[in-house]
Amino acid sequence: MTEVVAVPVRLRPSATAGVRLPELVAQVGAVLADGPGQAATVPDIPVTGVTLRAQEVLSGDLFAALAGASTHGARYAGVALERGAVAVLTDVAGVAELTAQASSVPILIHPEPRSVLGGLAAAAYGHPSNRMTVVGITGTSGKTTTTYMVEAGLRAGGRVVGLVGTIGIRIDGADIPSFLTTPEAPALQAMLAAMVERGVETVVMEVSSHALSLGRVEGTQFAVAGFTNLSRDHLDFHPDMEEYFEAKAVLFDPHSLLRARTVVVCIDDDAGRATAARAGDAITVSALGQPASWRATDIRSPGVGAQEFTAVDPAGVQHRVGIRLPGRYNVANCLVALAILDVVGVSPEQASLGFRDIRIPGRLERIDCGQDFLALVDYAHKPGALHSVLTALLQPDHRLAVVFGAGGERDPGKRAPMGEIAAELADLVVVTDDNPRGEDPAAIRRDILTGTVAAGGAAQVVEIGDRRAAIQYAVAWAGPDDVVLVAGKGHETGQRGAAETCPFDDRVELARALQVRDARLLPAPGRACQ
């Protein structure tokens, strides 16, 4: 069983030499605020940490007071000072929010303080990414799977590994829960420093477009970056697909300060080919027969949920590889992982040993309660991912059911396409709720159903808002050798409504439905989140 460790207030090193405040000020071009109590010059004091959460300040920290969605962080400067902050970094608007108490420490002003946080934190923690090998994985889908594969290969090769991603943080196999794909810049640098302290040699992390756009990985030196694919997602954050692509491209662009020393790119879509062309010297991979540095041939599936293929490396040497994941897209993810592992000195043979028993929470995760059909949970929550996973699960003479919804307060333009994809590929489509947040769940379902109507076809389409009841319906429908997929939430353990997040785990609910299925004693639907 995987070890679960206690979560500290914030994962950070037990000790750090820190950096002098004048050095930090000079590094980022901040200016000292005028006003009562402020010195004429920046005082020569040590800064041993950086945080933007007042409640997490430790003595010696610089507190970054940033503008938030509803309030300015400067309002909490008093809390930060009480906890031992030695300086405050903010913007002009933040200065106006500061109380008189804040005049007891240096107040630094920068027009865009968030943009310099990564560099400040990296300096305060001794530039931890320079003391280890950091691998970054980006792309719309496959980031989590690829990072887990790289981690598994590294551990099989005897390395001490850190992992940072959507599911959580891992240090040498021990799990630490997380809530962001990529943590905020100060937390990330503190985390990397703590990993150095614990003997981690290589860190593999998911790098989201949000993280790249918001500067969360500034101050990080990437040894290797991997690109999986690009399809529609996050258009509630990015104005269009072009900006979404550009956000991810900075890890590969030779003119970018964040560009990794070595880059690995899957060229099985247009975005991958454009990324490789921009990089100029990318190690390329293809699972679709494209000319590439690493290629997959002789792909075979001994059964639903497993594949074997031959990976042909840049020297033309063939390596037989097996993975317990279906779909050509997972062959592509595996090739990206193999190429990255080769760069950092892990052979395909060593990597394959790590892949053999890999289990990725909520990524085509099997739920087996002795039933005579296949039941799976997956994180697919966007059109491209849903298409890929449903295509991977299609088998002659086996019916396919999918239960899914779409998140509220997120890109509404992907709802109808997801409905159309589901109705085109599955035999049973159960449209349900998935983190409606502040939106009307029924309206979200209507958007999805518009797509199922557009698909036409013979799929049976059912609308059941209560997610528990929707899962139970699909389980009751399934017969021998059928496939039931519950998509969208994957590893998540809550259903987000407008006012609360209710405990809800698709894996638990699917197992529960399977356990009572034979007795036909399906319980009444539970309370929906409000």
Swiss-Prot record:
Superkingdom of origin organism: Bacteria
For this protein, the record's InterPro entries field holds: Mur-like_cat_sf, Mur_ligase_C, Mur_ligase_C_dom_sf, Mur_ligase_cen, Mur_ligase_N, MurE/MurF_N, UDP-N-AcMur-Glu-dNH2Pim_ligase
Predominant cellular place of this UniProt entry's protein: cytoplasm
Per the entry, which co-factors are needed?
Mg(2+)
Which keywords annotate this record?
ATP-binding, Cell cycle, Cell division, Cell shape, Cell wall biogenesis/degradation, Cytoplasm, Ligase, Magnesium, Nucleotide-binding, Peptidoglycan synthesis
The entry marks the following residues as binding meso-2,6-diaminopimelate, namely: R410, D434, N435, P436, R437, G488, E492
Sequence positions that bind UDP-N-acetyl-alpha-D-muramoyl-L-alanyl-D-glutamate: L52, T181, T182, S208, R216
Where found in the cell?
Cytoplasm
| Coiled-coil portions | none
Q: What is the recorded post-translational modification?
A: Carboxylation is probably crucial for Mg(2+) binding and, consequently, for the gamma-phosphate positioning of ATP.
Which transformation does this protein catalyse, written as a reaction? UDP-N-acetyl-alpha-D-muramoyl-L-alanyl-D-glutamate + meso-2,6-diaminopimelate + ATP = UDP-N-acetyl-alpha-D-muramoyl-L-alanyl-gamma-D-glutamyl-meso-2,6-diaminopimelate + ADP + phosphate + H(+)
Motif Meso-diaminopimelate recognition motif mapped to chain: 434-437
UniProt-recorded Gene Ontology molecular function terms: ATP binding; magnesium ion binding; UDP-N-acetylmuramoylalanyl-D-glutamate-2,6-diaminopimelate ligase activity
Its family remark reads: Belongs to the MurCDEF family. MurE subfamily.
Q: Which HAMAP family match?
A: MurE (MF_00208)
Q: Which NCBIfam families does the entry link to?
A: murE, PRK00139.1-2, PRK00139.1-4
**Function of the molecule:** Catalyzes the addition of meso-diaminopimelic acid to the nucleotide precursor UDP-N-acetylmuramoyl-L-alanyl-D-glutamate (UMAG) in the biosynthesis of bacterial cell-wall peptidoglycan.
Task: From the Swiss-Prot or TrEMBL record, give the protein name.
Answer: UDP-N-acetylmuramoyl-L-alanyl-D-glutamate--2,6-diaminopimelate ligase
